[in-house]
Amino acid sequence: MGYNKSLRYSRHDGTSCVIDNHHLKSLGAVLNDVRRKKDRIREAEYEPIIDIADQYMVTEDPFRGPGKNVRITLFKEIRRVHPDTMKLVCNWSGKEFLRETWTRFISEEFPITTDQEIMDLWFELQLRPMHPNRCYKFTMQYALGAHPDYVAHDVIRQQDPYYVGPNNIERINLSKKGFAFPLTCLQSVYNDNFERFFDDVLWPYFYRPLVYVGTTSAEIEEIMIEVSLLFKIKEFAPDVPLFTGPAY
């Protein structure tokens, strides 16, 4: 808007205007009043619902529920992922799973020494780019209810994947509804026969995940994959036996 000469003169010729500061309010105070009024309206809407909801107990996140989390890192591996494709993380057959370029097993022994009951089991995947200054996102697809005899393909095309969660870490809950895990000394089974540990101990009670990972990059990328299992153990079973005898 340009300069208008008529704006220099008052419309009220020959009169004076007196402004009373008691009737002025800052814009911030007005906005705060509006916000407080909205909060009071929202609280009035939720009051009858909150009274009913207070009678129920829910967990905010199953991973943070009751129990103790025990992590066992299976392996770290570097994979080369091509554009518009996704690679299978592990096929759960044999000790090496899927060995491609480099594999290092972290946990040689199971970290739980006594009879334990597993309340929940998570498959945790951590992804990291191997080259600096790479601007792409990690994508992922997975299936839980696959038939035990199904042979998964090592590479698939990306079709409607979703992005991996914050910090490039994704957790998948493997619990089956209505399946209770028996008390088992997991360390002895894990150390005696690692190859059969999954088929004999875990998969009858938990889902066997088939997980594929990829990137949004248009080039071949090298990514670091770290695979872990997170066991949620009941707290009543101690890590160290408190007594000695035939029952322990």
UniProtKB/Swiss-Prot annotation:
Keywords: Viral occlusion body
Gene Ontology MF: a single term: structural molecule activity
GO cellular component: viral occlusion body
Pfam families listed in its UniProt record: Polyhedrin
Listed InterPro entries: Polyhedrin
Entry annotated with the keyword Lipoprotein: no
Family that this chain belongs to: Belongs to the polyhedrin family.
Function, as annotated: Component of the virus occlusion bodies, which are large proteinaceous structures, that protect the virus from the outside environment for extended periods until they are ingested by insect larvae.
The protein's name in its UniProt record: Granulin
